[in-house]
Design a protein with these regions (language model features):
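N-terminal secretory targeting signals
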Residues: 2-65
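Catalytic cores and adjacent binding grooves of peptidoglycan-active enzymes
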Residues: 28-40, 149, 155-218
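Active-site acidic/histidine clusters and adjacent loop/turn architecture
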Residues: 52-121, 172, 176
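Extracellular/periplasmic catalytic domains that process cell-envelope and extracellular macromolecules
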Residues: 113-114, 137-142, 178-179, 203-206
Length: 218
């Protein structure tokens, strides 16, 4: 038995409008073609300026610092206190040279390993440098940054233990910072990461991240 269906004038009008839009080349927002189109990536804005590192990493200040963005195509930031991404903006300041080095390593690493997680960046320093807090003896003049080791399971968050670290990729990150002139790289004593002994040094509480320091600019 065929049941007669009555369509109201409002519904009929909506159907005609949809049909007209499709005929003009407008795809339905629920079509297969539009469902999987990724949103365009936001442009990473950085206010570049010539920075000056004063004093030492353990007793210094930062003049005209540059803030690392909260995230980009090749990196994410992590707040070690709140234990979430992104890191708060006031914790992401460094010299322009430091920010450039971090972004360069992140970009080159992502290009070499598109299957790997983005590089995780932790604390840099304060906008004007100075004492950062009880968990940081240095990070005072814009030359230090914490960088998390990639995890074996590819999750974009810091590893909990050295056993979760992808040591092959972590060593490559160490090597990339060395190639760009890092003067100090602290690594976890339970991670067999290597480099020139005067630069790559084991230090407690660094089993989930490395601490990189660059030289001050001229």
């Amino acid at each position: 038995m065929v049941r007669e269906v009555h369509v109201s004038g409002t519904v009929r009008s909506l159907c005609l409008i949809v049909a007209a839009l499709v005929g003009c080349g407008f795809a339905s927002p629920f079509s297969a073609e539009s469902r999987f189109i990724p949103a365009p990536a936001k442009k990473t804005e950085i206010r570049w300026r010539d920075s000056t590192a004063l004093g030492t990493p353990g007793d210094g200040r930062l003049v005209r610092g540059v803030r690392l963005p909260s995230a980009g195509r090749s990196f994410f930031t992590w707040d070690p206190v709140l234990r979430r991404a992104p890191n708060r903006g006031w914790r992401r300041w460094g010299t322009d040279d430091l920010v450039r080095v971090v972004l360069r390593v992140a970009r080159d690493f992502a290009e070499a390993h598109p299957e790997a997680p983005r590089l995780g960046i932790g604390d840099l320093g304060l906008e004007r440098g100075g004492y950062f807090g009880p968990k940081h003896a240095t990070h005072q003049n814009g030359l230090d940054a914490d960088v998390y080791y990639p995890r074996l399971n590819r999750r974009e968050r810091p590893p909990r233990t050295a056993a979760q670290v992808d040591l092959r990729l972590a060593q490559e990150i160490v090597d990339r910072f060395l190639a760009l002139g890092a003067t100090v790289i602290y690594v976890g004593p339970n991670t067999p990461l290597t480099g020139p002994p005067a630069i790559v040094q084991p230090l407690w509480n660094h089993d989930n991240h490395l601490h990189v320091r660059i030289a001050p600019g001229p």
